[in-house]
Amino acid sequence: EFARHVEAVTARTLTGEPLAVEKSRKNRWRVSTGGADRIVVSYLVYAREMSVRTNWIEADFAILNGAPTFLTLADGDIARPHDVTLELPTGWSLSLTGLAPQTDRGPHAYRAADFDTLVDSPIVAGNPAVCEFVVDGTPHLLVNLGESGVWHGPQSAQDVEKITREIYRMWGVMPYDRYLFLNMITEAGGGLE
């Protein structure tokens, strides 16, 4: 029921002319495009529920999950690429996700091959602790938010690298170009692979 977190939906043409938007169902909006084949849709998303399926944004960092964040066309055209560009607040330097970087479009621009990839690729932004290791030429990043003495990042990265090497030894292949382990370390516990 992610639509309850979406509000203030607006639309405009590429030249900035406003377009009419109406909420047609609790999880759908209809835009009168005026014949435009490309438009810009903007909206606000509630982001103060920390779980493995929702979003959390605070002064120091953001965790964005795709399903409660991104809208797409209702006609089922989910196989097309989806682009995401983040504008980070002053003082934030990193955005990290499994999405393909599009550095020609900016330091925080990404592309998902399709909507399923988009909603299955969480994004972390801020200044998290990042430890990197390489297995069989494939970079792996261990991204830790909230580490502050509870979790020793470099030692954790060494431990995760050992596990990853064993998995590679067993399967003989790395079925990805890059892998991110995203850890939000809180007193609440929990987790999701």
Listing of model-derived features with the role each one plays in the protein:
Residues 187-193:
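Catalytic zinc-binding patch centered on the HExxH motif and its immediate surroundings
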